[in-house]
Amino acid sequence: MSDVTVRQLAGIVGIPLDRLLHQLGDAGLQISDADDVLSDAEKMKLLNHLRQSHGKVQESVTEPKRVTLQRRSVTELKQGTVPGKGAKTISVEVRKKRTYVKRSELPETSDRLSEAEQARRALEEQQQRELAEQEARRQQEEMLREQAAEEERRRQEEAARTAEERRRRDEEERQAAAERETVAAKPAPVAAPPIPRPAPEPRPPARPSAGKPKAEAPRAHPAERETEARGDKRSAGLSRKDEYRELQGDDFRKGGGKRKKPKTGRPMLMPEQKHGFEKPTAPIVYEVAVPESITVSDLAQRMSVKGVEVIKALMKMGVMATINQVLDQETAILVVEEMGHKAIAQKEDDLEAEIMANLAAEAEAPQLPRPPVVTIMGHVDHGKTSLLDYIRKSRVAAGEAGGITQHIGAYQVKTDHGSITFLDTPGHAAFTAMRARGAKVTDIVVLVVAADDGVMPQTREAVEHSRAAGVPLVVAMNKMDKADADPDRVKQELVGLNVVPEEWGGDVQFVPVSAKTGAGIDTLLDAILVQAEVLELKAPVAIPAAGVVLESKLEKGRGPVADILIQRGTLKKGDFLLCGKEIGRVRAMFNENGKPLKEAGPSAPIEVLGLSGAPEAGDEFIVVADERKAREIALHREEKLRSTKLAAQQAAKLEDVFSLMGSEETIDLNLVIKADVQGSLEALRSALTELSTDKVKVRVIGGGVGGISETDANLALASNAILIGFNVRADGSARKLIEERGIDLHYYSVIYNAIDEVKKSINGMLEPEFKEQIIGIAQVREVFRSSKFGTVAGCLVVEGHVRRNLPIRVLRDNVVIFEGQLESLRRFKDDVNEVKSGMECGIAVRNYNDVREGDQIEVFEKVQVAPH
């Protein structure tokens, strides 16, 4: 320790300078100036002085030299209480303090203790004993006062009871005398004089016993106490009859102890049987929260009435409804007000707005640069996946069925220029919704156009999606290695869509590339990063994560799996996710290569396990801290979806009713679709439903993500539906049921194969269409009679030819008078099958004999035509 001045020591210790100087003087140090230097020896002397003054003497041995014990003894004092009750026990506590000193230190300690200390301890012990005695006396006096008060109360009750009995006996005597006067014919028995009941002598109070407290005697049972009381009454001179008279009061009548009928002149005193609770007269008015759609039963439950009452109110308003029918918000509010309650229009997103407000507050965290999210769009087979394949140096396209992309693939690529997140969307017409989702979550759209093919329908659609989302475009002219590649043609066609290249004065970068040779790939990546720098992409990192679901599926052994893209914040393992109507805790996270992760930041595409179900593709997800609120929101969203479906079903039923009026009956083709991912299911459902015609309606009655289960097979069996498995297979129990019941099951891995098969099924369900085709006309020249055929017409074939066993029509003056079958066809005397134009023949018409000269016989046949 170095030497310091007094002023410095005061600053180190944290005490005033004057106080430190005073303490130095008390320690015997001749220091008066604040700038004097203190040595280590002087500081130790000051420290020893302070310890002695505060009673802290430095000891070399940590072993205690004395032990102080506080002894507490409890004694019990038994105190008698009122008669009939057990004795009361009082606890008396005596506290003693003893100090034990080591024998080796005893002489020194005894010398150290002064006489004043010993006197103080003796005084404390005496005071404790006096306090204990005073407490015991106080408790005893209080107990005696309670006993005296209890005895006085019992005496007063006994006196009041005796006076009441005397008054009751006097009243009975007066009634008996009145009865004797009214009944003069019968000798009235003389009433016995009342027997006075001596008052019981009060018992002397029990003296408190100073012995050990005994266990309290068990209290008498109520029935035993009642029996003892009756015994006391009988011992006092009351008979059972007197007791009965006492109990019955005015209703007791003489004459064998039987009751007589009450006289009409004297009113009977009946006990009041009115209930104590009275129903409130004012009506109860509830505040009813009315959502956008609610069923009649739920509305009745919120108003605490029966559903029938709500239906009656609706009928008065002119609305016919059932208990399960869905009402809109306006109708429900009118019903609530009609029934006298207060309606409150409930907003659907109250809880969600609260959570979003919290997210908005958290979004004020500092923002850091993030990788760009790039979506690759273009027409089918223009080389989108192959281009991404070359960038990632892997065979992505080989894993897709038919070499086409059927759901969004998300990959993060680390290049020499930085990280880029790529989204590969399908280019088929059936995947329009998936391309629209890809445009919403992206920062830059790379439009891939084949230089040898030019602009195609899905190319125009991709331009519209990017323009609607306000996302900048980078055009990649692919397949430049082909001989017939024409980049100028691509530029001209895109200029027609208002996509102008930079070299022509526009703002869109056009990059010629080849996914096969890799030419222009680095230039394309540079163009993407330049565009990202212009956009200045940033996102907060140190907040809970939020983003969007790209795809979801149901995997065996892993459960619901969601492919998500984080847009802001950091997602950690164990976070609680709210994703559409699904919730769950993140059990595991994986990147696009299957590597497990503990956390992921913005623009990272990851795979998440742990949700309660497979969410819809395009749903937004957020990390919430309040698990209860998240469950409420998920339940509310599910209820809203169910209400929407019910309302749509109700509307569909009404539409079906009106469409059936005046129209032919339609045929339903029911389908049950199971797919590997949510996006493919959505695309299949949309594409197959659009195949409906006026005569055949395609209905998807069930669908989901995952393998075909026994439940799906039972649904298809019950609804006579076709089972379609898209990149999934049926499990063992489902296969057994499908084979036993002969359910129509089809597996597909390319969406267009499924569409073609359903088209064939629709054509097979249509009724065959037939067209009448006139093949010949014969002119009747003469009529003959035949014993075998009846009337036979001699005819000349003027048009076409006539064949045997075909339907015919007989025309007279170009009016059909008969339609039947050609029975016999002869030429001269020979039966022939066919007679050509310009030749004569004999025709016999089955079941018709009114053929005349000049008639025409028209021969026709029905030809089946393909339905359209």
Curated annotation (Swiss-Prot):
InterPro entries linked to this entry: DNA-bd_dom_put_sf (IPR009061), EF-G-like_DII (IPR053905), EFTu-like_2 (IPR004161), IF2_assoc_dom_bac (IPR013575), IF2_II (IPR044145), IF2_N (IPR006847), P-loop_NTPase (IPR027417), Small_GTP-bd (IPR005225)
Positions annotated to bind GTP: 378-385, 424-428, 478-481
Entry keywords, A to Z: Cytoplasm, GTP-binding, Initiation factor, Nucleotide-binding, Protein biosynthesis
Function: One of the essential components for the initiation of protein synthesis. Protects formylmethionyl-tRNA from spontaneous hydrolysis and promotes its binding to the 30S ribosomal subunits. Also involved in the hydrolysis of GTP during the formation of the 70S ribosomal complex.
GO molecular function terms listed in the Swiss-Prot or TrEMBL record: GTP binding; GTPase activity; guanosine tetraphosphate binding; translation initiation factor activity
Record family assignment: Belongs to the TRAFAC class translation factor GTPase superfamily. Classic translation factor GTPase family. IF-2 subfamily.
Bias-annotated ranges (Basic residues): 255-264
Biased composition (Pro residues): 190-207
Pfam families referenced in this protein's UniProt entry, alphabetically: EF-G_D2, GTP_EFTU, GTP_EFTU_D2, IF-2, IF2_assoc, IF2_N
Disulphide connectivity of cysteines: none
GO cellular component: cytosol
Start and end residues of each stretch annotated as Disordered: 103-274
Gene behind the chain: infB
PROSITE patterns linked: G_TR_2, IF2
Places the protein is found: Cytoplasm
Organism placement in taxonomy: Bacteria, Pseudomonadati, Pseudomonadota, Gammaproteobacteria, Methylococcales
NCBIfam families registered for this protein in UniProt: IF-2, small_GTP
Positions of the tr-type G domain: 369-538
Region (G3) residue spans: 424-427
Chain intervals for the UniProt region annotation (G5): 514-516
Region spans: G4: 478-481
CDD domains registered for this protein in UniProt: IF2_eIF5B (cd01887), IF2_mtIF2_II (cd03702), mtIF2_IVc (cd03692)
Name of the protein in its database record: Translation initiation factor IF-2
Species of provenance: Methylococcus capsulatus (strain ATCC 33009 / NCIMB 11132 / Bath)
Alphabetized Gene3D superfamilies for the sequence: P-loop containing nucleotide triphosphate hydrolases, Putative DNA-binding domain, N-terminal subdomain of bacterial translation initiation factor IF2, Translation factors, Translation initiation factor IF- 2, domain 3
Ranges of biased composition (kind: Basic and acidic residues): 103-183, 213-254
Region (G2): 403-407
